[in-house]
Design a protein with these regions (language model features):
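P-loop NTP-binding core
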Residues: 1-206
Length: 206
């Protein structure tokens, strides 16, 4: 199972949800990997406690390899970090991801992440993908590589408008790149049961 957690709106609890789901999966005995694709590295910090120069280069190094050429270039390898939790590993993210993005887009490397996950499939039962709060190279790569998409959602009118746009984008990615991708569910955050708007939004989603 490959699950991407994504919303193009920031501050909706995306990294927290991805880390907690991965931790629960590992606690249940599943061999679990979380790949952090967000240059902010929140999931990396949550799961390793590392910051700044302490963080292994991780997924950025993998994408750099895809840009390399020549007979001796290292290809398709990724460093996997063991967390303090049993059965839970992480591929870390660093700020270098932001610098790599335009180069990766120019070289059309959008399917490289899916190939990596195919290679890791024998080693892990569940793979979670934490993404940046933008519809960019990394999030599209993640949705091409995943088979399930989980969307964190804040109960406000702005989030509702963004959600419908996101669902259209996911459907387009499904049609063009990944017919196996399914929206698994919407995780409602900051729900206030006594307020009328959140209840209206929840009824609409249901």
């Amino acid at each position: 199972m490959r699950r991407v957690v994504f919303n193009q709106k920031g501050g909706v609890g995306k990294s927290s949800i991805a880390c907690n789901l991965a931790a629960v999966s590992a606690a249940e005995g599943h061999r679990t990997l979380l790949i952090d694709l967000d240059a902010q590295g929140n999931s990396t910090h949550y799961l390793t406690g590392l910051t700044g120069d302490e963080v292994p280069v991780g997924i950025a190094d993998f994408f750099k390899q895809t840009l390399s050429s020549g007979p001796f270039a290292k290809k398709g390898k990724v460093d996997i970090y063991e967390t303090p939790f049993d059965n839970l590993h992480v591929v870390t993210a660093t700020a270098e991801l932001a610098d790599l993005q335009p180069k990766l887009e120019a070289k059309h490397k959008i399917n490289k992440l899916r190939k990596l996950l195919d290679e890791l499939a024998e080693d892990y039962d569940r793979i979670y993908l934490d993404t940046p709060p933008a519809l960019n190279f990394y999030t599209v790569s993640a949705m091409i590589a995943a088979d399930r998409c989980l969307i964190p959602f804040d109960c406000d009118s702005f989030s509702r408008q963004a959600l419908y746009g996101l669902l259209r984008e996911i459907e387009e990615i499904k049609e063009d790149h990944n017919e196996d991708l399914e929206v698994e569910g919407i995780v409602v955050n900051q729900f206030q049961p006594r307020a009328s708007l959140p209840q209206q939004l929840l009824d609409e989603l249901i």
